[in-house]
């Protein structure tokens, strides 16, 4: 806080494996720094969502990288998609601002609209789209990165999707 940092992002690996996460969130919040979370969502039970909220968490960004089969394949865990959606629902039920984190690759670009439609039905209204980071697990799938032309098309699809929701009177943040 003394250095003017407005936000601290707790991310991974998976930050929810830390038993002291709520303590760290409360410390940041008490110091005037906005604590936010980046997670795969699978460890967010109803009780954990309330605990995170009570500690002062301001936002949970849950990573979903495709529709169920593609997401589970990417995550290497069967049921990861369903676990992420349950985590999202638990956060929303606890009153936490919650959004989607989606890394667009050649392998999951076709799922963009389907994932947004599905999670909008759950109550998500914030969608953050990312390009592939060549660090961590991204080093294993560098070949799945979008070409510049495909990236432009994906961005255009996100813009078109946002406009379509707006035109229907539904506001989403992208």
Per-segment meaning from a language model:
Residues 1-59:
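Conserved alpha-helical substructure of the radical SAM core
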Residues 54-55, 59, 63-65, 70-174:
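Radical SAM enzyme [4Fe-4S]-AdoMet core and its adjacent flexible, acidic
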């Amino acid at each position: 806080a003394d250095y003017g940092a407005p936000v601290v992002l707790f991310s991974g690996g998976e930050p929810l494996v830390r038993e002291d996460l709520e303590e760290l969130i409360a410390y940041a919040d008490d110091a005037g720094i906005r604590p936010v979370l980046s997670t795969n969502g699978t460890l967010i039970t109803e009780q954990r969502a309330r605990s995170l909220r009570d500690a002062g968490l301001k936002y949970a960004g849950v990573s979903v990288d495709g529709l169920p089969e593609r997401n589970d394949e990417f995550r290497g865990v069967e049921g990861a998609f369903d676990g992420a959606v349950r985590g999202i629902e638990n956060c929303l039920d606890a009153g936490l601002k919650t959004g989607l984190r989606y890394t667009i690759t050649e392998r999951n670009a076709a799922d963009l609209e389907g994932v947004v439609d599905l999670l909008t039905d759950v109550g998500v209204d914030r969608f953050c789209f990312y390009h592939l980071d060549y660090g961590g697990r991204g080093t294993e799938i560098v070949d799945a990165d979008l070409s510049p032309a495909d990236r432009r098309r994906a961005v255009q699809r996100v813009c078109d999707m946002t406009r379509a929701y707006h035109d229907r009177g539904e506001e989403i943040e992208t």
